[in-house]
Curated annotation (Swiss-Prot):
Similarity section: Belongs to the UPF0145 family.
Secretion signal span: none
Protein name per its UniProtKB record: UPF0145 protein Csac_0771
Coiled-coil intervals, chain numbering: none
């Protein structure tokens, strides 16, 4: 399945629009990961712990989006938008939401 942030696919013609598809994935970040990330924050630098969680959540959300598009009979999703949110009273959850338009291309 072709998945793209652009509204069209070069060299392909959209022959049918199947509708908007979306998926959301929420992951919890546990205390050990929070502790490791806070040490990184103190000394500066990137937090690989949070980055890995975001990557995993994004990949899950994209896969779920593709599954939903396939259920509609689509073979591509165009106009993908990926949003990230921090949830919970202490920011202990990360949400990735993905939306796009399921289409059939030739």
């Amino acid at each position: 399945m072709i998945v793209t942030t652009t509204p069209s696919i070069e060299g392909k013609k959209i022959v049918d629009y199947k509708g908007i598809v979306s998926s959301e994935v929420i992951v919890g970040v546990n205390l050990v990961k929070d502790f490791i990330a806070s040490i990184t924050d103190i000394f500066g630098g990137r937090s690989g712990t949070y980055e890995n969680e975001l990557i995993r959540a994004r990949e899950e959300a994209l896969q779920e989006l593709q599954n939903r598009a396939a259920m509609l009979g689509a073979n591509a999703v165009v106009g993908i938008d990926i949003d990230y949110e921090v949830l919970g009273t202490n920011g202990s959850m990360l949400m990735v939401s993905v939306t796009g338009t399921a289409v059939v291309v030739e």
